[in-house]
Amino acid sequence: MDFADYIRTFNTGDDAVLVRDFYAPDIHFQSGPRILRGTDELLQFLNWAHDGIREIIRAQTVLRDENRIFAEIDMDFHATKDKPDFTFGALKKGEFTTVKFFVLYTLRDGRVARFKAATWPPNLGVTKPDSAAVLGAAPAQAPAAHLTQATATAPTRAPVAHLTGSPATPARPPAALASPPVTAPSQAPSGAPAQRAQPARSSAAERLGGTPEGRQAFMDYTRAFSNADFDSFSRFYTDDVRCELPSAVLERREAIVGFYREMFKTVRESLTLHQLIADDAGLAADVTSQFTAIEDAPHFVVAALKKGEFVRVRVFVYYTLRDGKIASIRVARAGIPSKPQRL
């Protein structure tokens, strides 16, 4: 599938053509808790969602391998009529709001067979549209995709960092347009704490990326994180690493270490990795994270937990890399947390 063609078609607002040309008949579509099956359900949903709303994709980052595309998207929602009950906040005709989406497309025979999306709160961490996008013009093309080596699709259990954070309030109200736009929108197994981390590897072995060694380095990083081996997992960061959670931003390596050193006194984190796309520019992970209380944690940000209880949540995590080290981390929830359960 040509993702640039997909974006161009999406941005025309012709949902029937989009569904006909780019989605498999048995598409499984999930956006947060909403699940749709088949192209008939999908088209019905798009017709409803785009009643009075023009939706424009502005792709910020695209990673892909043979059968998957991961995209970080700033999505502009333009109101073509008053929408007081709009999902992402009330809009009047001529107003727009922007929402950051993290989307994983799984392909089969050149069409989207599975679609999974997570979002940040409106206007949080987004770029501003240029004048062409504001007027509803489709971008000429998507950003160049990073081609990656295929990774195993079978779930792999490993701990991972930075999956906490609660939804934030909108960063700013919708911006009014000078003129209206053109009219045309799993369960992870529980278990005992992970084994102790292995001895520190050489700097060459710590280089993250799309090679088999680079993906193994990512597993080493997550293993060190799960074992609270702060010296080891922090070696995978650049000095100026930036971690963007839905509710907070952590600047620099020492801030991330300090945040998790405090958290790990009461709550430990592990995950089931469902899919990973990797190249030398970045890593995109679709995971279910499990948070387990080792002491009572009544104020834990995901859910209040008693000692021995755990909670799970599906998330997308996107890491950008610089010289084989993590330079930035962005996290988005792909569903609501489970209710606390006991091991």
What are the roles of these predicted feature ranges?
Residues 1-343:
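C-terminal and inter-domain tail/linker signature
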